[in-house]
Amino acid sequence: MKISVIVTNWNGLNLLKKYLEKVIVNSPEADEIILADDCSEDESLVYVKELQKKYSKLKIIAHKKNQGFGRNTNDAVKKAKGELIVLLNSDIDPHENYIKNSLSHFKNPKVIGVGFAELGHENYAKLFWKSGYLQFVPGTSTKTHISAWLSGGSAIIRRDYFLKLGGFDHVYEPFYFEDFDFGLRAWRSGYTLLWEPKSIVEHKHESTISKFPKKFLIYVKERNHLISVLRNVTDKNLLLQNKIFSLLRILSGPNYLKIILAAHKQLKKYPTPICSSELSDKDILKLFEK
């Protein structure tokens, strides 16, 4: 199968200088390496164009208008030629064989994606319900296991299924939780996601997202976490629990009302991606009780 590696970037020149060449060298299985640039204002494109002289399989998709992480990724996946797509943040440093060690899983047609092991960081792969929300905790770190979601910055996925399921939902703009949401849609549609401990990458957590004010990042995380519940959960009892705990959070801190209103406003902007419903909410949760 042909493989495309997509590295998303926005004003990440320093990160590209540190890690892009390592991505190219440690991705010999890839037929193309795509730099998906989201209208950077620094010299990212100048640097990558110079690097293209050395690596013929390095390509550029450059947006003239900033679109946000989800749209940038979706557009690059549509234009990629590979049957398998490797998604990497610009601050990912992959180890040797990180792609190779994941490929055998795709012999199973039910498996549509595999998450990489981020060295030094927990794989928050197990899904459960608590306090009115979908929550996640680490899975086993030494063996392959199912994963509730795949990180949008360190995973490999079947291109056709990524597009079939609607890619990353724009409702989560500008970022956060779009990959978690995609994972929920994949499981609901009857597909399987895995986490592979031998596919090792180092996530340096130097992303350009960190340039945003901390207060704004917390707000977006809270809003999008709520959206992920309202967008995906259909069980009436679980939704009732969410309403009860949301009310309790409002009583303990009125700022949460702003988050609820913002979430509903965002939901009205974007239609829900259409996908099949092979599994119920409780069916999915039961898978992760084992």
PLM segments and residue spans:
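A conserved acidic beta->alpha catalytic loop
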Residues: 22, 37-46, 65
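Short, acidic, metal-binding catalytic loop of nucleotide-sugar glycosyltransferases
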Residues: 22-30
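Glycine-rich, basic loop-to-helix element that forms the pyrophosphate-binding segment
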Residues: 62-80
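Short aromatic/hydrophobic "clamp" motif used to bind/position activated sugar donors
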Residues: 85
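Conserved donor NDP-sugar-binding/catalytic core segment of glycosyltransferases
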Residues: 92-128
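Short, flexible, basic/aromatic active-site loop/helix in glycosyltransferases
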Residues: 116, 129-148
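A short, conserved alpha-helix in the catalytic core of glycosyltransferases
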Residues: 148-166, 171-200
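Non-catalytic, C-terminal membrane-associated alpha-helical segments of glycosyltransferases
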Residues: 234-290
